[in-house]
Structure formats: structure tokens, C-alpha cells
């Protein structure tokens, strides 16, 4: 019996290290190297088909090459929802494997606060970088983002949960990631930018379910890019 209890204790400890629910306020995921093995898998609080969403996060990288910032894959589509930084000042949003690209002024290297929202009824996608709105774009009007996703930070999924390419990997720090099943108002976006997110119900940095794979480290956030 003692051996069984000891084994269960060790198993529970190992499991808690691999899979955790944590308040990561004022902390970052550090992706310190280019790789095809280092990533964080996120487990959403709410799993449902999405006809609206808003996603916000902070990121800090000194890479000028393209890199994946947020990868949401389903069995039928690898780029069901993808945020991809093509280069400095240029980002692409993929929904259902279709994409739009948005461009704007951006300091480099410098931390960014990035938000995007999309509504199925109009197909309109909105973008906010460091609290400032960028040009709206339109894609996939009438579409529904599929449920049961594999959500990954640090890599771009070319297959469900895998198919990583180190030349698309993120190198840097990610923090304050939140996701809602609704389109936030401009006032809400500014609240998120100031550090007061209004009750995220899909992904919540303050109560995040995640699994670290490979060389990813949690550290205190030493930078701030709040714009207001």
C-alpha cells in the first residue's frame, strides 16, 4: 500500500508539472530558441463552435522573420484560426484556411499588445496594436469556427497538434493572453490594454490551463507596453 501511495504521489507530481492551471499575471512564457519541439498547448475553458471571438495577447520578440503567434487547429483544417506575423508591421489572420493581411506602423524591436476580433454575420475582422485600431478587413462571412481545437503557442500547426517547422517558430515572450466568444467594444479593448480584461470565457491568463512541451520557461514579465 505504501508503494502504491508513493507511486500515485510521484505520478500526480509529474502530471501537475506537465499540465497546470495557473494565474500567470505579471508573468511570461519564454520561448528562448528557434525549434520545432518547444511549444505550449492551451486548453480552453469553453469549447464551442464560434461565430464571434476576440483574442488579445502581449508579445515581445527581436526576430524580424515571419513567425506564428497563435495557432488554433482542428481535425479538418490546420489553420482554422491562426495569427501569423509575416514581418515587422504586417500580420495575417487565418479563419477556416482563408486569410487577410493587415499592415501598420510598429516599433521594432519592442513589445506589442495585439487584439483581433471577428464576427461571422458580417465577416469583419478588427485589429488593434498597442491600443490603436488598424484597418478592418473581411473574410469568411457566415462561417463558423469549429470546436475541439488544438491550440498552440510557439509553433504553427500544419497538422492537428503537430507538423511544426522551426522556421515558423516563435522566439521571444508571450503574456496576457485572453479570448472571448464575443466581439469586444473599443472601450473593452482599451480596458484589456490597460490590464483590466472583462471576464474572458475561453482563455484566461489569470486562470490558464496549459501544458508545456520542450524548452519553454515561465518568468516574471520585466517589460510593459500599456499604451494608456
Swiss-Prot record:
Glycans are attached at residue 52. Its cofactor is Ca(2+). Binds 2 calcium ions per subunit. It comes from the Eukaryota. One of its GO terms (molecular function) is calcium ion binding. Ca(2+) 1 binds at residues 78-79, 156-158. PROSITE patterns: PTX_1, PTX_2. Keywords: Amyloid, Calcium, Disulfide bond, Glycoprotein, Lectin, Metal-binding, Secreted, Signal. It is found in: Secreted. Pfam families: Pentaxin (PF00354). Residues 25-224 form the Pentraxin (PTX) domain. Disulfide bonds join 56-115. Residues 1-20 form the signal peptide. One of its GO terms (cellular component) is protein-containing complex. GO terms for biological process: host-mediated suppression of symbiont invasion; innate immune response; negative regulation of glycoprotein metabolic process; negative regulation of monocyte differentiation; negative regulation of viral process; protein-containing complex assembly. Ca(2+) 2 binds at residues 156, 158, 168. PANTHER family: C-REACTIVE PROTEIN-RELATED, SERUM AMYLOID P-COMPONENT. Homopentamer. Pentraxin (or pentaxin) have a discoid arrangement of 5 non-covalently bound subunits. Belongs to the pentraxin family. It is linked to SAP is a precursor of amyloid component P which is found in basement membrane and associated with amyloid deposits. This is Serum amyloid P-component. It comes from Rattus norvegicus (Rat). The lineage of its organism: Eukaryota, Metazoa, Chordata, Craniata, Vertebrata.
